Regions:
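Short, structured segments at the rim of ligand-binding sites
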Residues: 1-363
Length: 363
C-alpha cells in the first residue's frame, strides 16, 4: 500500500476474463479506505472465486455479492479498523479449484497484522509450482514465508515488502506448448528461444512430458540464447494414467497431441480445469468428439482413446472464448485437413500475435 497505508476506495475494478486479476487484486481491497467493486466479462461470472473471498472475510472484510454467491460481481468493504495482533491470523480455505486462491492470500500476508497462517483444507493442491513461484517471489521481496506443503500450511511473517531494483520476468512457458507440441504432431523440429535453465513454472515440465510422448529434446545455446528444441517424427506415444495435477494449464495442448497417440491416455488430477476460462474438460471432450476422435470426462480428468486416421474429419472448432482451446484447435489442424477455428482472436489474451507466429512456424 502507499505510505499512508491505504489505497483509494470508492472505485471499481474490471477484471475482464483474467484469473490473476480477479483473484489477486481483491486482496489489495483489504487496504483501501473504502469499498471496492469488482466486475468482469459475463463469462467470468462462471469462474469460482469463493475460497479467496472466504479468506478475506476471515480477515475481517465484508463481501457483498451482486449475483451468485462466490462469483463476480461483488463489492469488498475492508475492515474499519486494523487490529494489532502479535500472532498470525489463521485462515482456512479449500483451494482445490485453483492455486490462485492460495497465491492471492499469500501476496497480502506480510501486511496482515501479525502475519498470516494459511491452511488449505482440500485433498489436493493443484498447480503447486505456481504457489512455489509465489513463495519465491515473496522471498525475493524480503518477505519471510514458511511452506509446509505436506501439511498444506503456509505461514507469512509480518513486515515490509522490499522490492528488488530489477526483476527478471521469465517468458510464459505454457505459451510454448502449442509450438513445441507441433513437432510431435506434424514431425519436424521446433525451437523456442529464451528457455530458462531453471524455473518454478509448471510449463517447465513440458519438455519432460513431450519426451515421454516420443520427442527428442535438447537445449542448444546459440549466440548466448538458450533454446528448447523439440524434434518429432509424427509418432506419439500414449501415456496411460498420467497425473497432470502440477501443470493442468498445458492440458489442452497435450490433449491435442494425444488425439494422435498409439494408445489411450487418462489425464488425471485436473478436475479444477472445469473452473478455468471455460469448463475445459467438457470443451476438450466435445471438440475431440467433433473431429471424430474419442474422449470423455473423468471425475478428475479426461480420457483420450486414439482412433484410426480415417475416422478424423474436417470440422469448425469452437473456442469458448478460451485462448487455450483456440491453440488446441490449431494443433489439431496440423494433421486433420479442413479444420477451421472460430474466434482465433481469443488467443490475444496471452499471445496477441499467435496467428503470425503459427504461420511463420509452418513456412
Amino acid at each position: 500500500p502507499p505510505s499512508d497505508g491505504r489505497f483509494h476506495g470508492g472505485t471499481k475494478v474490471f477484471c475482464g476474463l483474467a484469473g490473476t486479476v480477479m483473484r489477486f487484486v481483491p486482496g489489495l481491497a483489504m487496504f483501501a479506505d473504502g469499498p471496492v467493486a469488482f466486475d468482469g466479462d459475463e463469462q467470468a461470472y462462471a469462474r469460482p472465486m469463493k475460497p479467496v473471498l472466504d479468506g478475506l472475510e476471515q480477515l475481517g472484510a465484508c463481501i457483498e455479492y451482486h449475483g451468485e454467491e462466490g462469483r463476480l460481481p461483488f463489492t469488498i468493504t475492508p475492515p474499519q479498523t486494523v487490529s494489532q495482533c502479535a500472532e498470525p491470523s489463521v485462515v482456512s480455505i479449500d483451494s482445490s479449484g485453483s492455486s490462485q486462491f492460495i497465491s492471492g492470500l499469500l501476496l497480502i500476508g506480510s501486511r496482515v497484522p501479525g502475519g498470516l497462517e494459511l491452511h488449505h483444507t482440500g485433498e489436493k493442491t493443484p498447480s503447486l509450482p505456481h504457489i512455489r513461484m509465489t513463495v519465491a517471489d515473496l522471498h525475493g521481496s524480503g518477505v519471510r514465508v514458511n511452506a509446509d506443503e505436506h501439511a498444506r500450511v503456509w505461514t507469512v511473517q509480518p513486515g515490509a515488502v522490499q522490492l528488488p531494483e530489477t526483476v527478471t520476468v521469465e517468458p510464459d512457458l505454457s505459451n510454448a506448448a502449442p509450438f513445441l507440441g507441433a513437432a510431435l504432431i506434424a514431425g519436424g523440429t521446433v525451437r523456442v528461444p529464451h528457455w530458462p535453465e531453471s524455473t518454478t513454472q509448471p510449463g517447465g515440465m513440458l519438455p519432460g512430458y513431450l519426451e515421454r510422448m516420443g520427442a527428442e529434446i535438447s537445449f542448444p545455446v546459440i549466440d548466448d540464447v538458450r533454446y528448447c528444441e523439440v524434434t518429432g517424427n509424427g509418432h506419439v506415444s500414449g501415456l496411460g494414467d498420467f497425473d497432470l495435477t502440477a501443470a493442468g494449464e498445458i492440458a489442452p495442448s497435450l490433449a491435442a497431441i494425444l488425439v494422435f497417440a498409439d494408445k489411450p491416455t487418462r489425464m488425471i488430477g485436473i478436475g479444477h480445469l472445469r473452473g478455468h476460462e471455460t469448463n475445459r474438460l467438457e470443451a476438450l471432450a466435445n471438440e475431440i468428439t467433433r473431429v471424430g476422435g474419442a474422449a470423455h470426462e473423468l471425475p478428475d480428468g479426461l480420457e483420450i482413446t486414439p482412433v484410426s486416421a480415417n475416422h478424423l474429419r474436417p470440422s469448425v472448432m469452437e473456442t469458448y472464448a478460451d485462448h487455450r482451446m483456440a491453440t488446441f484447435a490449431a494443433m489439431l489442424g496440423l494433421r486433420i485437413k479442413g479444420i477451421q477455428v472460430k474466434n482465433v482472436a481469443t488467443t490475444a489474451k496471452t499471445l496477441p500475435n499467435f496467428v503470425d507466429l503459427w504461420n511463420d512456424m509452418l513456412v
